[in-house]
A protein has these predicted regions:
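C-terminal catalytic/acceptor-binding lobe
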Residues: 12-16, 20, 164-250
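Short beta-strand-to-loop acidic/aromatic patch adjacent to the donor-nucleotide binding site
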Residues: 99-113
Length: 250
């Protein structure tokens, strides 16, 4: 079994963006699936199950695990909170039963993209170095003085079993900020490999170049196509030409 589980959480409002992300993965892999990573496609309870989305993901990942959330919450933040908590409980159940055996889980949304072809290996190396329960992009704001790590992050598969307060989610605050003090107590690490550009649009190429130079391999938060466009120019096109474009350091 692969060491990393990539989780893409989807509700009906971002099916189109999720499909574009899956298409980008297919273009990056170009017929040769990623190594060391499986995919889990998590639908909110009321979300349709698009055939194209699953077919595209299956081109990039040797294993795709569709899962429909059992929670009924809708709206923000209750909807995504319920999906994440239910998904993580399912992941823990599958590991407790020994059916799965991943080292870590990358929980993501439709506005998260890889900036390099070997992102699974780079994230696994970062996870090994971090030696923590949560690893991702830290922000100083949130519900608690410790700030929070954005929810597009790496988690131990058994995270929700480590503290009884992780068994449910708030309906008034996003889960990653609401539960931040617990994650901090359990152990978290701010890693450069995962970065967040919150609600960003029209991002210029030099921003992605700088992120890559600073070791970012996974980016969340860009709400338009500019991140995907950059990946197509700098990863997909470069692979077809037989080389990679890397920004100069210094």
């Amino acid at each position: 079994m692969s060491r990393l589980l990539y989780v893409l959480q989807v509700w009906h409002g971002d099916v189109d963006m999720a499909t574009e992300v899956a298409r980008l993965h297919a273009e990056i892999t170009d017929g040769t699936p990623y190594q060391d990573v499986d995919a889990m496609l998590v639908y909110r309870r009321d979300c349709p199950r698009p055939k194209e989305l699953e077919e595209l993901l299956s081109k990039s990942f040797s294993v795709v695990r569709p899962y429909r959330s059992r929670r009924h919450e809708t709206g923000f933040p209750a909807g995504p909170n319920g999906v994440w908590c239910d998904m993580m409980q399912h992941v823990a159940t599958m590991h407790r039963s020994k059916e799965w055996n991943y080292d870590c889980v990358l929980t993501t949304e439709a506005d998260a993209v890889p900036l390099v072809r070997d992102w699974p290996q780079r994230l696994l190396a970062a996870w090994d170095r971090a030696d923590s329960i949560v690893a991702g992009c830290w922000h100083p704001n949130g519900e608690h003085a410790v700030g929070h790590i954005n929810g597009n992050a790496l988690f131990d598969p058994m995270t929700v079993t480590l503290d009884p307060r992780l068994s449910g989610c708030s309906t008034r605050a996003a889960w990653d900020t609401y539960l931040a003090n617990i994650f901090h107590q359990l152990g978290w690490e701010d890693i450069p490999e995962i970065r967040n550009l919150y609600q960003a649009r029209n991002v210029e190429s030099f921003v992605f170049d700088h992120l890559l130079r600073d070791d970012c391999v996974w980016l969340h938060g860009v709400k338009d196509s500019t991140a995907r466009d950059w990946v197509r120019r700098n990863v997909v096109s470069s692979q077809k030409k037989g080389f990679f474009i890397l920004p100069q350091r210094g």
